[in-house]
Each structure stands twice: as structure tokens, then as C-alpha cells.
Amino acid sequence: MLWYIVAGAGGLLIGYLIASYQINQKLRKAKEDAQTIIEKAEKEANEIKKKAIIEGREEVHRLREEFEKERSRREEELRAFEERILKREELLTRKEENLEKREHQIEELKANLEEKMREVEEKEKRIDEELKRLAGMTVEEARELILEEARQRYEHDLAKLYKEMKEQVEEEVEKEAKKVIAFAVQRYAPDYVGEITVSTVSLPSDDMKGRIIGREGRNIRTFEKITGVDLIIDDTPEVVVLSCFNPLRREIARITLEKLVADGRIHPARIEEMYEKAKQEVEKAIKEAGQEATFKAGVMGLHPELVKLLGKLKYRTSYGQNVLNHSIEVALLAGYMASELGLNADKARRGGLLHDIGKAVDQELEGSHTTIGAELARRYGEKEDIINMILSHHGEEEPMTPEAVLVAAADALSAARPGARRESLENYIKRLMKLEEIAKSFKYVEKAYAIQAGREIRVIVEPDKVDDALAEKLAYDISKKIEEELEYPGVLKVVVIREKRSVAYAK
């Protein structure tokens, strides 16, 4: 019996343990399943969250782009609207300015009309007063009045007669002047070669070029530094070229190089030595050139320093014309014209020879060559009438004597002589174009032509709007503007042409 009880209790205990084990297993599995479900749910929640964030960012980006596009469109519309407003304001401003101009013109017309009305009223009053006065005049008073009116009426005819007589006298004077100038030119016919800005030096062989250049170019650098002249060595056989706008420096450099080539020893110290010798030779040549110039011009008794300065003019040019030859030419021409007119030929030659003496040192001193020349002449004992010739040949002073006028005329004649002076083609063309532009800038000018190598400008005007008096004034105004705005050698002639053509046909 007890055994059955124990067996039953044991069976119950075993059954309880088995049931408890099974329950624990189910609980553990349920927990694991619950954890798995939680982890899966969290994972899905994270993925949904990330997706939502990405979609949100994309939506924000899309909205931002749409906003930027809309903002740009609005700004463009606003800019276009502002431009339309500005254009409208400019249009209104122009209209306002035009309106003000029209109002100003109307005011001027109104003022002119009122002025005319006042003049008419004054004339009416004068006529009324004149009629009242005439009613009580004597015969003699009426006669005087008629004569006064006749004088006023024919005053224009008298002025025209005066003009014709003046033109006739000027024509006779011009003919006589041309005879004197032609006589002087016939007596003086110089041979002249245009000056250039380069000199050539012949070499015994092309090997000498390397010696002139020197090691690493030291000889040529020293030569150019000392002389101030460009030494050009090219492929031309047995020749080198010296280039410089200053003829004096170029001549000293030429003699220096010839001495170096003849000696054969070329190095910096030798270059300096030969340069000093060349300077001494040129100084001697300058003195001889001055003495020869005084002899050719027939001028005696000049101060030695003036003779030396004259020699320096041999190495100066003006528009390609040698200044010393030009001075001799002016002296002879002035002397010939003075002799023809019965004036002092010696004084004219002296003034003509010294008229450009200032150009010998105008690169070293401040001032115009005429002012410098007058100061030099005064310093070395020349008389005041000679000094006046120097100052007056370019108009800085009024000429005091007839000989001073002849010196100025001879200077212009020498400069204007064909072939005496030259310019480069480019400067020549620019000067002619500028000359025609100046003439065409005046009112009533139809055409303008520069002729005679730019020494004459012919201006064709509108005949219906320009009378003889206005034509003379126009020629004067054009000549003054040319003097102010244009540089040119010699004298430039301005001719105003007024041509009126009337055509009729006989049938």
C-alpha cells in the first residue's frame, strides 16, 4: 500500500518536473520570439525613419530649387521693370530738355520780335520828327540834309573804290617785290645736298667688325657710350653705319672710328684717346667752317666766339636743311635785295648771317633760338639793329629797319625754295591732311585742296553765302588758325575762291 503511495507520489513528482521543464522551454522560446520581433520592428522603424529623412531632404531641396527659380524670375521681372522705368525717365528728361529749349527759343523769338517792334516804333517816331522838322526847314538846311543822305547812301561805293585802289597798289608792290626777289635768286644759285642722319665708315675687311664689337661687345658698348651715337653692324660687306640725329656727335664718332680702324688697336682706353683727338679735329673744323662762312657771306669784323658759333651751325639741320648753308644763303639773298632797293647791303648780310646763330646752342640753353641768338649777339658786341633782325625774323619783335624786313623775307625765301627742306613722307601726308581739315572746319567752305607741296591751300566757298569782304576775312581767319595749330617750313599761302556761274540758253 505504501509502495503504491510512494510510486504515485514519485509519478506525480516526475510529471510535475516534466511539465515544469516544458513550461520553461516554452517561456524561453516565447521570450526569444518576442526579442526577435522587437529587433525586427526596430530595424524596420529605423529604415522607415531613414527613408523619411531622405525623402524629407529631397523635398526640401526640391522646394529650395523651386524657390530659387521663382526668386530669379521675380528678380528678372523686377530688373526689366526698372530698366523700363529708367528708359521712361530718360525719355521724359529728353522731352523736358527739348521743351526747355523750345521755350528758350520762343523767349528769344519773342524778345527779338519785341526788339523789332521797338525799332519800328522808333523809326516811325524819327520819321514823324523828320517830317515835322522838314516842314520848318530853309533851302540851305534841306540841301545839307540831302547831301548827308547821299553820303550815307554812297558810302559803300566809296569803300568799294578804296578797296579797288588798295588792291591795285598791292598788285604793283607785289610785282616790284617779285622783280627784286627774282633778281636776288638769279644772282645766287647754290649747289645743295640734303642732310642725312647716318654716316658710313669703310673697313679694310669684314674681320674688322669683330674687333670693333670686342669681347662680349665691350668695345661697341664703350664706343656708343662715349660718342652718344648708334653703331650699326649688319651684313653689308666692309661697311659699318653710324646713326644719330645730332650731326656734330655723328661727325666726331665717324672720325673716331676711322682713326681706330686705321690704327688697328681697338679697346676701351684707345677709344677714349681717339675720341679726344677727334673732338679736337672737329673743333678746328668748326672754326674753319665759321671763317669760311663769313668769307662767303662777305661779313667781316665778327667776334671770334660768333665765328665759332657759326661753325657749329654746320652740324645743325632744320627740316633736313643745313643751318650754316641756310644762313649764308639768307645773308646773300638779303644783301642782293638790299642792293637792288638802295639799302645797306652790308648790314643786311650781317643780320642774315647771324639770324639763326641761336640754333648753335639752343639745345644747351632754355628759350627760343631767336631769344638766345639775340642775347649772344648783344654779349659779343653787335649793334641793336642787328639784334632786332635776329628777333624779328620770326615775329618776336617788330622790325625796326627795312633791312630787318629783308632778312625775314630772305629767311622765308630760303626755307620755301623747292628742295631746300624736306620732311618724311608720313609727316608730309599728315601735314597736308591737317591743313585741309583746318580749312574745311570753317563755315561756308565746300572744298579745300593743299597744293604746291603743301605751301598753298585753295579753299572753295559757297558763292551764294560768301561775298568779297567775307572771303577776305575767311582767308585771314584760316591763315591765323593754321599758324596756331600747324608747324610748317617757310610761308604758306591761303587762297579763297568764290566762283559764281550763271547759265542761260539761246533758242
From Swiss-Prot:
GO MF annotation list: RNA binding; RNA endonuclease activity
Single GO biological process annotation from the record: mRNA catabolic process
Superkingdom assignment: Bacteria
Cytoplasm in keyword set: no
InterPro entries linked to this entry: HD/PDEase_dom, HD_domain, HDIG_dom, KH_dom, KH_dom_type_1, KH_dom_type_1_sf, Ribonuclease_Y, RNase_Y_N
The entry's keywords: Cell membrane, Endonuclease, Hydrolase, Membrane, Nuclease, RNA-binding, Transmembrane, Transmembrane helix
Compartments reported by the entry: Cell membrane
A Pfam family it matches: KH_1
Bilayer topology: Single-pass membrane protein
Cellular component per GO, a single term: plasma membrane
CDD domains named among the record's database cross-references: HDc (cd00077), KH-I_RNaseY (cd22431)
The protein's Enzyme Commission number: 3.1.-.-
Keyword Transmembrane helix: yes
Domain KH: 197-282
HD domain sequence ranges: 323-416
Membrane-spanning segments: 1-21
Function: Endoribonuclease that initiates mRNA decay.
PANTHER family given in the database record: RIBONUCLEASE Y (PTHR12826:SF15)
Similarity section: Belongs to the RNase Y family.
The protein's name: Ribonuclease Y
Provenance organism: Thermotoga petrophila (strain ATCC BAA-488 / DSM 13995 / JCM 10881 / RKU-1)
